[in-house]
Each structure stands twice: as C-alpha cells, then as structure tokens.
From Swiss-Prot:
Effect of E53A: Loss of function
Record note on disruption phenotype: Altered 5'-processing of primary pre-tRNA transcripts with short (<5 nucleotides) leaders; in the presence of the truncated inactive allele encoded by rph in strains derived from K12 W1485, including strains MG1655 and W3110. In the presence of wild-type (catalytically active) RNase PH no effect on processing. No effect on growth rate, a slightly stronger effect is seen when combined with the inactive rph allele.
Family the entry assigns: Belongs to the Nudix hydrolase family. RppH subfamily.
Function of the protein: Master regulator of 5'-end-dependent mRNA decay. Accelerates the degradation of transcripts by removing pyrophosphate from the 5'-end of triphosphorylated RNA, leading to a more labile monophosphorylated state that can stimulate subsequent ribonuclease cleavage. Preferentially hydrolyzes diadenosine penta-phosphate with ATP as one of the reaction products. Also able to hydrolyze diadenosine hexa- and tetra-phosphate. Has no activity on diadenosine tri-phosphate, ADP-ribose, NADH and UDP-glucose.
Activity response to pH changes: Optimum pH is 8.5-9.0.
Listed Pfam families: NUDIX
Gene this protein is translated from: rppH
InterPro entries tied to this protein: Nudix_hydrolase (IPR020476), NUDIX_hydrolase-like_dom_sf (IPR015797), NUDIX_hydrolase_CS (IPR020084), NUDIX_hydrolase_dom (IPR000086), RppH (IPR022927)
Keyword Hydrolase set for record: yes
Cofactor: Mg(2+); Zn(2+); Mn(2+)
Cofactor annotation remark: Magnesium or zinc. Manganese can be used to a lesser extent.
Domain Nudix hydrolase: 6-149
Placement of sequence motif Nudix box: 38-59
Name of the protein described by the UniProt record: RNA pyrophosphohydrolase
Length: 176
C-alpha cells in the first residue's frame, strides 16, 4: 500500500524503560541497529499495526507495554536510490511513519526476538535516550531526531519520577 507520492505507510516504535533508556535492536545478521518498525496493512489502523509489529519483532503484547505518546504528524524519509526497487509498481521511494512511544511495564525477560519465522532482529540492548539519533543509518537520522525531540519531555518526566538511591557513591563502594 504505497501512497500517491511513493511513500509506504509504516509505524515506528520507541520502547523505553522506567529509567528513560530506550530499546535499541540489531538487525538480523547485520551490524546496523534501529528501533522496531513495520508496514501498515490495508484496513489496519496505525495502532493495530504497532501492536502487530511489536509482537512480530520483539515478542511483546499489549499487556507488556503502555502507550505514552504518538507523533502528532506522519514523518517521512526517502530511501537511498540504491535501496529503491525500481522494478516494482508502484515504486516505493520511502516510508511515511507514525511513531509510538511505549513504556515496558513487564520485565526484560518478556522480550523475544524469535517470534517470527523470519526475525527482523537478533539482539537488543538498553541505551541512553539520545544515542539512537547519532547511531542510526544516515537516511533515517532526521526522522529519528524529530521523533526523539517530540517524545523527550515524556521520557524525561519518567526519569524524574524514578526513585534514586539515597547515597549512590556509598552504594558503588559496597559493591566494588
């Protein structure tokens, strides 16, 4: 389902933990990392597509997450010419995305990259909030910057509400 401008409707998913870190996933068999994302099927809403992709790509269901926000507008990026499949009709020149910010409310153990017969990812880790903007492939960087800027206040409020150890330096000394 490609629009008149050549963009495929898609959802992007930023999953954060209670500390304000975000899930960063490694593409299967590659050295590139990104947030989960995927196409919207005909007749499917963006939210329905998000929950489907969430399960297909990282094994999480509705009960494992809480929606904190979604982008106000659709955000678009163009594919590099070398990635455009010119022999398909209609030609897809990029993605237009609705992004969702989710908080993981279950444990990390619920994350499972192997729920699909063709997994998108083969690993993941928690990273600092702005890390993905610097690390994502260049053609997605502007969209990532806009998404993270739009969601920043929500994630920062989570961090402010997370209890901090009373004496962090003493805690480090006791452990080490």
């Amino acid at each position: 389902m490609i629009d008149d401008d050549g963009y495929r409707p898609n959802v992007g998913i930023v999953i954060c933990n209670r500390q304000g870190q975000v899930m960063w996933a490694r593409r299967f068999g590659q050295h590139s990392w990104q947030f989960p994302q995927g196409g919207i099927n005909p007749g499917e809403s963006a939210e329905q597509a998000m929950y489907r992709e969430l399960f297909e790509e990282v094994g999480l269901s509705r009960k494992d997450v809480r929606i904190l926000a979604s982008t106000r507008n659709w955000l678009r990026y163009k594919l590099p010419k070398r990635l455009v499949r010119w022999d398909t009709k209609p030609v897809c020149i990029g993605q237009k995305q609705k992004w969702f910010l989710l908080q993981l409310v279950s444990g990390d153990a619920e994350i499972n990259m192997q729920t699909s017969s063709t997994p998108e990812f083969d690993g993941w880790r928690w990273v600092s909030y702005w890390y993905p903007v610097r690390q994502v492939v260049s053609f997605k960087r502007d969209v990532y910057r806009r998404v993270m800027k739009e969601f920043a206040s929500v994630v920062m409020s989570l961090q402010e509400n997370t209890p901090k150890p009373q004496n962090a330096s003493a805690y480090r000394r006791k452990r080490g």
